[in-house]
Amino acid sequence: MQEQYRPDLIEAEVQQYWAENKTFKAIKDTNKPKYYCLSMFPYPSGRLHMGHVRNYTIGDVVSRYQRMNGKNVLQPMGWDAFGLPAEGAAIKNKTAPAKWTYENIDYMKNQLKILGFGFDWDREVTTCKPDYYKWEQWFFTELYKKGLVYKKTSTVNWCPNDETVLANEQVHEGCCWRCDTPVEQKEIPQWFIKITDYAEQLLGGLDHLPLWPDQVKTMQRNWIGRSEGVEITFQLANSEDNLTVYTTRPDTFFGVSYVAVAAAHPLAEKAAENNPELAQFIQECKNTKVAEAELATMEKKGMATGVYAIHPLTGEKVPVWVANFVLMHYGTGAVMAVPGHDERDAEFARKYGLPLLNVIKPINGEPLLEHELPYCEHGILFNSGEFNGLDFDAAFNAIADKLEALGKGKRQVNYRLRDWGVSRQRYWGAPIPMLTLENGEVVPAPLQDLPIELPEDVVMDGVKSPIKADPEWAKTTYNGQPALKETDTFDTFMESSWYYARYTSPKFAEAMLDADEANYWLPVDQYIGGIEHATMHLLYFRFFHKLLRDAGFVTSDEPADKLLCQGMVLADAFYYTSPTNERIWVSPTEVTLERDEKGRILKAFDKEGRELVHSGMTKMSKSKNNGIDPQEMVEKYGADTVRLFMMFASPAEMTLEWQESGVEGAKRFLGRLWNLVFEYNKHPAETTVEPTALSSAQKALRRDVHKTIAKVSDDIGRRQTFNTAIAAIMELMNKLTKAPLVEVQDRAIMAEALSAVVRMLYPITPHICFQLWKDLGNTEAIDFAPWVEADAAAMVDDEKLVVVQVNGKVRAKVTVPAEMSEDDIKQVALADSNVAKHLEGLNIVKTIYVPGKLFSFVAK
């Protein structure tokens, strides 16, 4: 064993051993309980960032721990390889997206290997390869045959100059990123999958995911947005036409003072035919793309249509307005407005001089005055005809019943969730497998024609997708007849919605999945990824699993039993202001710091000596140039040190502040562990621990060892508080470094302790532990060594600390043998000088004993 800890010598050697022995290869074994641990796969952007390192370190710790606990562990890795950034990089670097992507994959794969992650690389999937997306295309055609796929027009960002569709990321302040032309909203046909058919299952399934974070489940519930309401039909005045609205508050129905419709509503478009001003307003609304999240805060705008709707219960006319806050794709594209009892409706009504009608009063109060409106809580109806005096529930049902009896309404469950639009007018994605025949009929491509391959050797001009620009690519045949391929590609969330399942049989060529393998490994036991995916990927992931279940591939209802959402990695960010008033961000690796005695940053300077502004700890990002390159850190400190810091510096689900001083501390700790094993090996143990031969000091040290084992096992296995597990090991190490190695049993206890510490640290710092395990005389590799178990007998305390009180105040703490009787403890307490002093001149009237903890005297 070498004297110094040299990660640069150890780590590459251990990684080579793992690669040559295929240590982490997962093979189905029905004799062992399986454990599938999965971290969200990366987009191959070029380099790993610290967020990746944190995610994959957590997954690797869990995987190695479970393997030591006798599980058959699957921990795969792959690449979410399609996506818009590749197109931008290809244009910038004058290359093809495929070439750029594959080069990045090679580079990042090597980065993952030098961090020592125990992935089964034989199961690697790359989503841009035809053998992967072939089955995605096939599955889409099967969903189409089941009626779960349809095509309809939908709004996109359109650059009229380039005549191309733009992704949201390519619209900068309302203009095209390339030519600065104002962007328009355009309706084009797009493909959708009916996720709304599964809304109730997706909602109900959340109740069966006890090991998912509540925050994620709440976000999904809100995203699905189930509501119970009434769909109400208004007859239009002087017309045969109707207008349907949806409301969750039928109790406020008598407070309707106007109806608002979306700019794209047929009624609005019809009303605009002879009203140029209204037509212009509608066009303005359509060209202003608004995210749902912005609706609450944006300025409310509207215009009267000149059309009136007849209130079905009062017969009164209410005006119909076009409003920019009504979305065509939610509900019916029309809302009944009740300004007296809705904030948004009130804001609009006050702006345009529309009445605020008050029809709900507080349950225990008087009707409110107009300036106190809107009153948005549930209450008691008044000014509501026959429904006066009813509370919310009674009014909901009574008004719904009345409308249903009149044929003017029906109870309805609505969802905020929209069907999943999967068409993208981009090149770098999987082609959508639909064909258009000469007669206009659209048909799914047959299996024998799949995959419809994306040409990889292309030139990107930054304007048009190469498969849209090349009319020859689209030409094909169907049953001998000419046909055209769809030139849109799939949303890249399609690939990431089923990759977890393909890992179970990545090379299976006969079908999308090998059902035997899928049902052995699935569901995923532990899934790890960022909470930013809560309402997109994690919802599609659950949806796809139900689709796979209904197609007969899997038997489980949910894709993952347990979810851990790791926190972001933060780092200090520094900048100076340029002469043009621009912030120039400087990498923390190029900054010299002055700190106070508590380590707080006082001043920061760049290499030119410029004083910098410290903007605090923020998420590592390219925009603030505060990312720390994992590879540089591994080269400087070793992979184990980086991994240890990542797991120790913060609870897994909280943000982690990157502090190089903390990384240095992690390296010193591993150095102390190495030194302790080196010193122990000079005089190793000649015998095993003999519990009956131990002194009280030896028993105490051994007790600490086994209590630490119990805590670490619980912290890693159940609680997943990895940082507290490491803290407990560090605390034990402090005791071990001070422990004597003189007696035979001293060395026996040290042997037992070091064997335990090395195994407990192995999931976190596997390279050093692999080597130390060998240095401690073990012939088998640590990778399949059993997890260390705490000895219950060793944890029993020989002594206990009893607090002594006199009249409720602590007067002493006495250490007594664990088995000492109450009477004997009383005598020890009475013998204490401070207790005796406070009992002097008093009569003991009562004693209270809480076994092993407290002895209390009540005296007068």
UniProtKB/Swiss-Prot annotation:
GO BP annotation list: leucyl-tRNA aminoacylation
GO CC annotation, single: cytosol
Ligase as UniProt keyword: yes
Extent of motif 'KMSKS' region: 619-623
PROSITE patterns in UniProt: AA_TRNA_LIGASE_I (PS00178)
Motif ('HIGH' region): 42-52
EC number: 6.1.1.4
Alphabetized CDD domains for the sequence: Anticodon_Ia_Leu_BEm, LeuRS_core
Subcellular location: Cytoplasm
Entry GO MF terms: aminoacyl-tRNA deacylase activity; ATP binding; leucine-tRNA ligase activity
Pfam families xref list: Anticodon_1, tRNA-synt_1, tRNA-synt_1_2, tRNA-synt_1g
Amino acids binding ATP: 622
Keywords, comma-separated and alphabetical: Aminoacyl-tRNA synthetase, ATP-binding, Cytoplasm, Ligase, Nucleotide-binding, Protein biosynthesis
Catalysed reaction equations from the record: tRNA(Leu) + L-leucine + ATP = L-leucyl-tRNA(Leu) + AMP + diphosphate
Family: Belongs to the class-I aminoacyl-tRNA synthetase family.
Protein name: Leucine--tRNA ligase
Organism (species): Pasteurella multocida (strain Pm70)
Gene symbol of the encoding locus: leuS
